[in-house]
Amino acid sequence: MSKTNYSVAVLAGDGIGPEIMAAAEQVLDAVSNKFGFTLNREHHAIGGAAIDKHGKALPQSTVTACENADAILFGAVGGPKWEHLPPDEQPERGSLLPLRKHFGLFCNLRPAQLLPALSTASPLRADISEQGFDILCVRELTGGIYFGEKGRSGEGENESAFDTQRYSRKEIERIARFAFEAAKLRSSHVTSVDKANVLASSVLWREVVTEVSKDYPEVKLDYIYVDNAAMQLVKQPSQFDVLLCDNLFGDILSDECAMITGSMGLLPSASLNQSGFGLYEPAGGSAPDIAGKGVANPIAQILSAALMLRYSLGQDEAARTIEKAVAEAVAAGVGTPDIFPNAGYTTNDVAAAIVARI
């Protein structure tokens, strides 16, 4: 019998975080009632709110709560109020990065879906955007050039700097398996992004991904160089299902995927570790300029909650129900001003419309 009682650490954070989190919790209440499972949610301070209350962006009490939870639902952190602090003490670097490191969150999932009702919001040409697309960017988050040896030396004309791209077989294999497992829940197609024509690390990447693919005969695998991937995302994004990327390539391409949808307020993300424990958050920021005005788009937070249900709590049917309700609400023209400028819907209106469709 599958588990029906879960513990979730809710970290709403700053700016629009509390507003969009409240909307997501309304949706979680509706879907948990429908499917008969219980979500025990504990709310804890994070980011600027935690600095104000506890003197640091990531208090130990919050870390402990996360350790005792099945998943973390994260809102947004940061704002002008805390920009005077040293960089490592500011909300973003002082909370999100340490959480990722503490829990070994090496797998970043960034879905990018263009709903038919929003095809005109996409910056892509109409004949391309009208086809729609549904892409999942799987990015390795803790290895590669961002974490390799780096430094500077010399002076004047002889001054130089270097960064080192390094990947181990183990790091590549575990992210590849996540991509193939994710593809099984989708359209069973993985495209591995590399630069194997010039980079030694990409040669190993391609070799390991090929080996892992043998354990997933039902999943189609193809390869693409990163420069071509950047072009094809603009030319024909509908050809992709799961994009498997290293840290650097995934950092760039996941933002491109996000931008061609037309609204960051629609895009969720997940960061997972080896055991499936994850941190789920909207792809956008804390947007302090619109905080408290009731116009923040809650859909990215709501879809992040759906990802949590799917990947950490094993409630895929509940996740699909949320995603379907979101699509239906948007198709009916329900949305905040960032996607429907003249519709007049508030954050709470959007949440209510989605709940009504569950």
UniProtKB/Swiss-Prot annotation:
Entry keyword annotation includes Manganese: yes
Q: Per the record, what is one GO cellular component?
A: cytosol
Q: Any idea of its EC number?
A: 1.1.1.85
Subunit-structure text? Homodimer.
Q: Which family does it belong to?
A: Belongs to the isocitrate and isopropylmalate dehydrogenases family. LeuB type 1 subfamily.
Question: In which residues is Mg(2+) bound?
Answer: 227, 251, 255
Cofactor(s) this protein cannot do without: Mg(2+); Mn(2+)
Q: Name its cellular compartments.
A: Cytoplasm
Identify the InterPro entries for this entry: IsoCit/isopropylmalate_DH_CS, IsoPropMal-DH-like_dom, Isopropylmalate_DH
Q: For binding substrate, which residues are annotated in this chain's numbering?
A: 100, 110, 139, 227
Q: What is this protein called?
A: 3-isopropylmalate dehydrogenase
Stored PANTHER family? 3-ISOPROPYLMALATE DEHYDROGENASE
According to UniProt, residues marked as the site described as Important for catalysis are: 146, 195
The family database entries (Pfam families) matched by this protein are listed as: Iso_dh (PF00180)
The organism encoding this protein is Pseudoalteromonas translucida (strain TAC 125)
Catalytic activity annotated for this protein? (2R,3S)-3-isopropylmalate + NAD(+) = 4-methyl-2-oxopentanoate + CO2 + NADH
GO biological process terms, alphabetically, are: L-leucine biosynthetic process
Q: Which UniProt keywords apply?
A: Amino-acid biosynthesis, Branched-chain amino acid biosynthesis, Cytoplasm, Leucine biosynthesis, Magnesium, Manganese, Metal-binding, NAD, Oxidoreductase
